[in-house]
Regions:
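Short, Lys/Arg- and Gly-enriched loop/turn segments at beta-strand edges
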Residues: 46-54, 86-94, 224
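Short Fe-S-cluster ligation motifs
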Residues: 221-226, 230-254
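Local cysteine-cluster metal-coordination motifs and their immediate loop/turn environment
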Residues: 106, 177-178, 200-229
């Protein structure tokens, strides 16, 4: 198997998207397509998977030790990028993107490359609607917030039902797994789960398909190599929306 090396890059800009989310822009562009991810090496800490939000950027939510270490870095510091890895979104025909929270990161690239006709963006509150101004310039954007501070007062799933999902050829989805599971349920009800393309997040050790830590029950498909994007009909009978696994392989309820 051809091993993709980790490439050192310099952080050229850090954009605070919200109190807990930052975009790290780096000195090199990678041939990433929407949905591709990379393994990010944080010196002295760990190597973690992150989706590309641009061909020279990742957008990160601070959730643990590794991301906390990343947030401690400054412009001019170096990190390692191994990628692009995995498969990506492969939209055909009329395409809708549905994003929740930091799940907007890989779908941002889809929109900026002109591959999304319509976009549904959700967050808890207005200040957490990632890239909303940029997305409004390149696609037909509708927003939903849990607290009603911007756009629809409610969830992206409510906007999805109103959008007639069966009328789209492709529906690209990324966000909290509970949200994505609800989107899949809507597509099942509409009789078109195969139109959904879902970007999954699983614990990864290697990112290149060797260790098996990111395999999906019961198919054995590897999120890092066979994914991270899967169609709804492929994951419909998996653990998707029920549980993930931690570093030791133990189940963690969603």
């Amino acid at each position: 198997m051809h091993e993709i090396p980790s490439v050192p890059v310099v952080i050229t800009d850090i954009i605070e998207e919200s109190p807990s989310i930052r975009t790290f822009v780096f000195s090199r562009r990678f041939p990433a397509e929407p949905g591709h991810f990379c393994m990010v090496w944080i010196p002295g800490t760990d190597e973690i998977p992150m989706a590309f939000s641009a061909q020279n950027a990742i957008t990160v939510q601070k959730v643990g030790e590794a991301t906390e270490a990343l947030f401690a870095l400054s412009r001019g510091d170096k990190i390692g990028i191994k990628g692009p890895l995995g498969n990506g979104f492969s939209p055909t025909g009329r395409t809708l993107a549905v994003a929740g929270g930091v799940g907007a990161a890989p779908l941002r690239l889809l929109a900026t490359l002109g591959m999304a006709d319509d976009f549904i963006l959700g967050a808890r509150t207005a200040g957490e609607l990632l890239f909303s101004k940029e997305l409004a310039d390149v696609t037909n954007l509708k927003c939903a917030t849990d607290d009603g501070t911007h756009g629809h007062h409610g969830f992206v799933t409510e906007l999805l039902r109103a959008a007639d999902p069966a009328s789209y050829d492709t529906i690209c989805v990324c966000g909290p797994e509970v949200m994505m599971k609800a989107v899949l349920a809507i597509l099942i009800d509409a009789g078109c789960p195969e139109k959904g393309q879902f970007s999954l997040h699983r614990y990864m050790k290697c990112g290149v398909g060797i260790c098996g830590s990111c395999c999906i029950d019961h198919s054995g498909l590897r999120v890092c190599r066979d994914g991270p994007v899967f169609t709804g009909d492929v994951i419909i009978n998996s653990e998707f929306g029920s549980y993930t696994r931690d570093a030791s392989g133990r189940r963690k309820p969603i």
